[in-house]
C-alpha cells in the first residue's frame, strides 16, 4: 500500500503534465481534443471502479448504470428547467451525482450478500435493469433518448469543444486527488485490510460491511459525475450509450491501466481514448483487438501499465529516529471497578446435531491471566469465535464490561477492547510490517470517510 500510494503521488503530476502537453497539441485538432475530453470523462468513472475493484476487491459490471443515472439526470433536468445555463448544469449535475450515490448505497447493501462471480452477475443485472428503465421510460425519451442538451456555461464562457478538454481534465484530476486522499487516510487502510483479509479486518475493528457500502457509493458518485459531463458535452443521451458494453469498457480501462490506485485509471482511459482515435482502422474487429490487448496485459503485466511503474517504488526503510520518544505511557481508561471485564453465561454452540460448546460459563477477574486448555476438537476456537462475534451463539450470552454483546458483529466487539488472534496467523500479506501494526490501531482512530476525502487534520492523526 505504501509503495502504491507513493508511486501514485509521484506519477500523478507527470500525468497532469502530459495532459497539458497533449492539450496544447490538440488546440488545432478537434479530433484530438474531443478524444481527450471523453478520455477524461471515462477516467472519472474508471477511478471509482479502480477503488472498488483494486482496493476493496469488489467487482462491478454495472458501472454504466450509475453513468446513465448521471447522464439522464443532466439531460432531463437541463432540458426541462427554465433556468439560466450557468445554474441549470451545476444543479442538475449535483442532483445526478446525489442520486447515483444513493443508488450506490443501495446496491452496496445488496452486494453484501454476494461474492466473486455472483457479485459480478448481480452488478451486471443492475446495469441491465438501468438500461431497461432508460429504454422503456417515455419521460426519458425511450429508445430515442434525450437530445438538445445545453452545454455548461459559466458567465459568457460556454464549455464546449476545446475548452471542454481542460474542464473535463480539471475535474478528472480533482477526482484523482480526492480519491488519493481517501486511500492515504484511515479509510484507505480499511479498504486495503478488507481486500487482504476481510475477517482479520473485522476483528481488528474495521466495519467491513460499512466500508464496502461506502466504496460502492463513492464509485457510483464518480460514475454519475462522468455521466453528467458526458451528457452535457455530447448534447444527446441514448440508452445504447450506457449499455453493458460501457461497463465492460470501464473494466477494461482499469485492467489495462492497473487497479488499486488513481494513476492506473487515468492511464487506462487515455489508452482506450487513443485506440478510439485510430479505431476506424479496425472498427469491425474492435472487440477482438481489445480482447487480445487484455490477454497480453494479463500475461506480460498482470498489474497493468501502472503496475509496471509501481514496481519501481518499493517500500523504503524508515528513517532513524533523531529525537527520543516520550517515555510517559498513554493514560488508559479502565472499566468500572465492580463490573467484570468479561462474563460468559451458559454459552452453547451447535452445528446441526453436533454440540461443539456445551453450557460454558465463566467470569474473568480484572488483572488476571486466564488460560483455556483442551484437546483438539474440544471447542476452544468455537468459544473464542462466540466471544469475539465471529460465530453466532445457539444459547447463552456474553457480556463485556457490563454490556451484552451477544450477536454483535466482530468490529463492535473489538471497539470495546476485545482483541483476538487465530490458530493460523492472518497477516495482511500485501501490506508492510508497519501497515500491519497500524491496522491494529484502527478502532482508536477517529477519522471519517469524509475527513479522509477532504484531507482534514483528523485523517492524518
Where are these regions (language model features)?
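Transmembrane alpha-helices and adjacent helix-loop boundaries
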Residues: 1-325
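The feature captures the beta-strand-to-loop junction immediately N-terminal to the Walker
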Residues: 373-375
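Conserved ABC transporter NBD signature motif
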Residues: 396-404, 416
Amino acid at each position: 500500500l505504501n509503495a502504491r500510494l507513493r508511486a501514485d503521488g509521484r506519477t500523478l503530476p507527470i500525468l497532469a503534465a502530459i495532459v497539458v502537453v497533449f492539450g496544447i497539441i490538440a488546440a488545432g485538432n478537434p479530433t484530438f481534443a474531443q478524444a481527450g475530453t471523453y478520455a477524461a470523462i471515462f477516467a472519472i468513472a474508471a477511478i471509482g471502479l479502480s477503488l472498488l475493484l483494486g482496493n476493496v476487491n469488489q467487482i462491478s459490471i454495472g458501472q454504466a448504470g450509475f453513468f446513465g443515472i448521471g447522464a439522464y439526470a443532466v439531460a432531463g433536468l437541463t432540458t426541462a428547467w427554465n433556468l439560466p445555463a450557468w445554474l441549470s448544469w451545476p444543479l442538475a449535475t449535483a442532483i445526478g451525482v446525489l442520486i447515483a450515490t444513493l443508488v450506490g448505497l443501495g446496491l452496496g447493501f445488496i452486494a453484501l450478500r454476494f461474492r466473486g462471480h455472483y457479485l459480478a452477475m448481480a452488478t451486471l443485472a443492475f446495469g441491465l435493469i438501468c438500461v431497461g428503465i432508460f429504454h422503456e421510460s417515455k419521460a426519458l425519451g425511450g429508445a430515442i433518448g434525450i437530445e438538445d442538451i445545453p452545454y455548461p456555461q459559466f458567465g459568457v464562457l460556454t464549455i464546449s469543444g476545446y475548452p471542454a478538454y481542460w474542464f473535463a481534465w480539471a475535474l478528472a484530476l480533482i477526482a484523482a486527488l480526492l480519491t488519493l486522499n481517501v486511500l492515504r487516510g484511515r479509510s484507505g487502510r480499511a479498504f486495503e485490510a478488507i481486500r487482504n483479509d476481510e475477517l482479520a479486518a473485522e476483528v481488528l475493528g474495521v466495519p467491513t460491511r460499512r466500508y464496502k457500502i461506502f466504496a460502492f457509493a463513492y464509485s457510483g458518485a464518480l460514475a454519475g459525475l462522468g455521466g453528467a459531463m458526458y451528457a452535457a458535452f455530447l448534447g444527446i443521451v441514448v440508452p445504447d450509450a450506457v449499455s453493458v458494453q460501457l461497463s465492460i469498457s470501464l473494466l477494461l480501462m482499469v485492467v489495462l491501466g492497473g487497479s488499486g490506485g488513481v494513476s492506473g485509471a487515468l492511464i487506462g482511459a487515455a489508452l482506450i481514448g487513443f485506440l478510439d482515435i485510430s479505431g476506424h482502422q479496425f472498427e469491425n474487429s474492435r472487440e477482438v483487438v481489445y480482447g487480445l490487448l487484455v490477454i497480453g496485459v494479463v500475461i506480460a503485466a498482470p498489474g497493468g501499465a501502472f503496475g509496471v511503474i509501481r514496481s519501481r517504488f518499493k517500500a523504503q526503510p524508515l528513517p532513524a529516529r533523531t529525537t527520543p520518544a516520550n517515555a510517559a505511557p498513554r493514560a488508559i481508561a479502565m472499566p468500572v471497578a465492580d463490573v467484570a471485564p468479561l462474563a460468559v453465561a451458559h454459552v452453547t454452540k451447535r452445528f446441526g446435531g453436533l454440540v461443539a460448546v456445551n453450557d460454558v460459563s465463566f467470569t474473568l477477574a480484572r488483572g488476571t491471566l486466564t488460560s483455556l486448555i483442551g484437546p483438539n476438537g474440544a471447542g476452544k476456537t468455537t468459544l473464542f469465535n462466540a466471544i469475539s462475534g465471529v460465530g453466532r451463539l445457539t444459547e447463552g450470552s456474553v457480556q463485556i464490561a457490563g454490556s451484552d454483546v451477544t450477536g454483535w458483529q466482530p468490529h463492535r466487539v473489538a471497539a470495546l477492547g476485545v482483541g483476538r488472534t487465530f490458530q493460523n496467523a492472518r497477516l495482511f500479506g500485501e501490506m508492510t510490517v508497519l501497515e500491519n501494526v497500524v491496522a491494529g490501531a484502527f478502532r482508536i482512530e477517529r477519522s471519517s470517510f469524509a475527513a479522509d476525502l477532504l484531507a482534514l487534520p483528523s485523517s492524518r492523526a
